[in-house]
Regions:
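Catalytic cores of extracellular degradative/oxidative enzymes
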Residues: 2-116, 132, 151-155
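Extended, hydrophobic/aromatic-rich amphipathic alpha-helical segments that build helical scaffolds
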Residues: 2-8, 118-126, 143-153, 307
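Structured loops at beta-to-helix junctions and adjacent beta-edge loops in soluble globular domains
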Residues: 8, 171, 264-266
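Short, functionally important structural connectors and interaction interfaces within domains
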Residues: 10, 14, 177, 247-250, ...
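Carbohydrate-binding/catalytic loop surfaces
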Residues: 19-32, 80-108, 164-185, 232-250, ...
């Protein structure tokens, strides 16, 4: 893994894509693009914990490059406009991207829509400061991206009268299930973004107004809920005609509703009921999966504290 990342991601280059630098096909799977509903983020999960922070510079630069086209997407799809009065008013990206800064939903709106994908990318680059404590780099390169992302989501959220929550809408759990509002995937990513942005702003002693605004929104997001059979619910409402059985497709490869456990920080030993519900969810999903999905599962079990299960995977 270290070799693959070092070979695919160096300063001055693009970040690692789906096939890295080894693609030899004119028509590779998924165009050898950047999938930002798990794959691009996962490429960089080992970077900091294995002391390879320098390999993440291309990712930070790439995400920064998504901001300009992402502002157009935010204006066209979300009505959040950047102009001379609000020069950094918010950006968004979705499931697919390219070296040319594609930020629209992609080939098919149904699975291509992922309004919280950009929040997930920000989670990756925030880790650069968490591991290096490079305050100068946080101020110059990372925080401006985080700040503008939070600016977008604080305007994007709407009030759901049925649940009382502030929700993202519409939401689609990556490649799985129906379109709903305020699913666990998006709510948890936005919550983590707000939490991280507050920490960053505090470290830089800046943006007190933004800190206050998103601090008020965090408790209204309420991303994690336990279902009737003890699981972390993937969708807020799972008892209507859009749903079959438990998780719509038992054993589905994506486990997007557990991002609060890993790579997020919302489900921990300090939230024992949610931690137990995460175990129920993982056991129900099973161990069989694609290679990348197994990698996610072993990290989830490690966060739970079950090293033996991680080793088995």
């Amino acid at each position: 893994g270290r070799y693959l990342l070092i070979s695919s991601s160096r300063e001055g280059s693009l970040p690692a894509n789906l096939q890295g630098v080894w693609n030899n096909n004119n028509n590779p799977p998924w165009s050898s693009d950047y999938h930002i509903n798990v794959n691009l983020q996962m490429n960089y999960w080992p970077a900091y914990v294995t002391n390879m922070a320098e390999t993440t510079i291309p990712l930070v630069e790439y995400v920064d490059g998504l901001r300009e086209p992402g502002r157009v997407t935010a204006a066209e799809y979300a009505g959040i406009v950047t102009d001379e009065n609000n020069p950094e008013n918010g950006w968004m990206a979705h499931t697919q991207s390219t070296p040319f800064g594609w930020t629209c939903p992609g080939w098919d709106f149904y699975w291509g829509w992922s309004a919280a994908a950009s929040a997930w990318l920000v989670q990756n680059i925030w880790e650069h400061y968490e591991f290096t404590e490079d305050l100068k780099y946080l101020k110059s390169d990372i925080y401006p991206i985080m700040r503008e992302s939070s600016m977008f989501y604080k305007q994007w959220l709407i009030h759901d009268e049925n649940s009382g929550r502030m929700v993202s809408s519409p939401t689609y759990s990556p490649e799985h299930g129906p379109v709903t509002i305020g699913n666990t995937y998006e709510q948890s990513l936005i919550e983590q973004l707000f939490v991280d942005t507050i920490i960053a702003a505090n470290a830089l002693e800046t943006d007190s107004e933004l800190r206050d605004e998103i601090s008020e929104l965090i408790p209204k997001l309420s991303p994690h809920h336990i279902g009737e059979w003890g699981q972390i619910k993937e969708w807020y409402e799972e008892d209507n005609a859009d749903f079959n059985d438990k998780d719509v497709e038992k054993g589905h490869r994506h486990i997007s509703h557990l991002l609060g456990l890993y790579p997020g920080k919302a489900i921990t030993d300090e939230t024992p009921e949610l931690l137990e519900a995460a175990k129920v969810t993982l056991n129900d999903r099973g161990d069989e999966a694609t290679g990348w999905a197994k990698a996610h599962k072993l990290n989830l079990w490690a966060r739970i504290g079950d090293g033996n299960r991680s080793h088995k995977l």
